[in-house]
Design a protein with these regions (language model features):
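Conserved N-terminal diphosphate/IPP-binding helix and adjacent helical/loop segment
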Residues: 1-112, 122, 126-141, 197-199, ...
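Alpha-helical phosphate/pyrophosphate-handling elements in metalloenzyme active cores
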Residues: 2, 52-112, 162-163, 209-254, ...
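Structural helix-adjacent loops and short alpha-helical linkers that scaffold large soluble proteins
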Residues: 44, 170-174, 298-306, 360-361
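All-alpha helical catalytic cores of prenyl diphosphate-utilizing isoprenoid enzymes
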Residues: 44-51, 74-79, 149-150, 157, ...
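A glycine-biased, small/acidic residue-tolerant capping/turn segment at secondary-structure junctions
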Residues: 48-53, 131, 265-274, 303-308, ...
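Short acidic/histidine-centered micro-motifs embedded in hydrophobic/aromatic stretches
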Residues: 53-57, 112, 129, 182-186, ...
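Acidic (Asp/Glu-rich) catalytic motifs at the cytosolic membrane interface
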Residues: 116-133, 257-269
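Divalent-cation-assisted or electrostatically stabilized phosphate/pyrophosphate-binding catalytic cores
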Residues: 133-155, 204-218, 245-249, 271-297, ...
Length: 383
């Protein structure tokens, strides 16, 4: 279990079917998704080197891509997106009066979400020139950019193979075509958001509104797909079900809040908790929300200084980073950004309440109640 989840006061020891706390669900789902990813890699990825590189990325192999003993494996992420889809799936089933589904019908889709997310991380690390991911060397820093691009491409293709999964059998797969289409749409939106993010690096006219449009694609597209797709499978592919827009809105708002919190951690997060060097976003002059808010709120002199620093074409020095931090503190940029994260969290909870059929129904549905708790964690996490 990633260190960032330790603040969720519980012990992960129950199965997904009987779990009663958020951390129980997350632990059970993560174990199930990891097992499914391993099966997908074995069944779909023929090249052993690619399987090794992917296993390394997930923390299951060393830098030589040789599998590690279970006790030595690194934490490979939170499995947040699969958990979102599975909790929405089970929550929507519960709302219809059905018992928790032990047949794993939503597992292939949840697995595909995690593979798409990780393909994007491998490519993001290349584009951002990041040397660390989850406290370990990034894939590209070990095998080079060209091979790492190929590893990411392999993961993206494997995601769609995973989504088909056992639904290839006759009679299975109600709604599978729709969630595959949703996953493809989310992938396209993610690339559009990433293009905007890269474009921001060389522009000096980026606004807060442009930022929100960017993260709606880069981050929120996949969380929207997760919550919408999970609910859609529970409603057996009934695309016109009135609850589905609320599930989609929940995922979108949660994804927006998640990315804003990520921006805060990119400046003020601790390396021991984020797995990345503290202040990396400042040194790369990323126009994240705290910086854009500072440019909007700063005095003319401070705005000019910050603009000049972010117009540089090289990574900032230590003194220059300190200057940026001083300006951000003067403008209370961290608190302002957190307000935006909290606002999106509140909007996510409102949408979730609508999806549940009201506040009482939300509290009475253990899966959706866990999503309520997860929303609070996402917008206040430290890693």
């Amino acid at each position: 279990m990633p260190a960032a989840l330790d603040s969720l006061d519980s012990t992960a020891h129950r199965t997904a079917g009987s779990a009663s706390t958020l951390q129980d669900y997350l632990a059970a789902y993560a174990a199930r998704i990891d097992a499914e990813i391993a099966l997908v890699l074995e069944a779909e990825v023929e090249d052993p080197w690619l399987r090794g590189a992917i296993s390394y990325h997930f923390g299951w192999a060393g830098t030589d891509f040789v599998p590690l003993p279970a006790a030595q494996r690194a934490a490979g992420g939170k499995r947040l997106r699969p958990a979102l889809s599975l909790l929405c799936y089970q929550g929507a089933r519960r709302r219809q009066g059905w018992a928790a589904d032990e047949s794993d019908d939503a597992i292939p889709f949840a697995t595909a979400l995690e593979l798409v997310h990780n393909y994007s991380l491998i490519h993001d690390d290349i584009m951002d020139r990041d040397l660390l991911r989850r406290g370990r060397p990034t894939v590209w820093s070990i095998c080079g950019k060209a091979q790492a691009i190929n590893v990411g491409n392999c993961l993206h293709a494997a995601a769609f193979a995973a989504c088909l999964g056992r639904q290839r059998a006759p009679g299975n797969g109600t709604g599978v075509g729709d969630v595959i289409a949703a996953l493809a749409t989310a992938s396209l939106q993610m690339t559009g958001g990433q293009r905007q993010d890269l474009m921001f690096e060389t522009r000096d006219d980026v606004t807060v509104d442009m930022y929100f449009q960017m993260i709606a694609g880069k981050t929120a597209a996949l969380t929207t797909c997760a919550t919408y797709g999970g609910a859609l499978l529970a409603y057996t592919g009934a695309r016109a079900h009135p609850a589905l827009p609320a599930y989609a809105e929940f995922g979108r708002e949660l994804g927006m809040g998640f990315q804003i919190r990520d921006d805060i951690l990119g400046i003020w997060g601790m390396e021991s908790q984020t797995g990345k060097p503290s202040g990396g976003d400042i040194r790369r002059r990323k126009k994240s929300l705290p910086v854009l808010l500072a440019l909007q709120e700063a005095s003319p002199g401070a705005r000019a200084r910050l603009g000049a620093l972010y117009a540089m074409t090289t990574d900032l020095t230590g003194d220059q980073e300190s200057d940026v931090r001083s300006i951000l503190e003067e403008c209370r940029a961290q608190a302002l950004a957190q307000r935006h994260a909290d606002l999106h969290g509140q909007r996510a909870l409102s949408a979730l309440t609508n999806a549940a059929g009201g506040a009482d129904a939300l509290r009475d549905n253990p899966f959706l109640a866990a999503l309520e708790q997860l929303t609070g964690f996402v917008t206040t996490r430290t890693g």
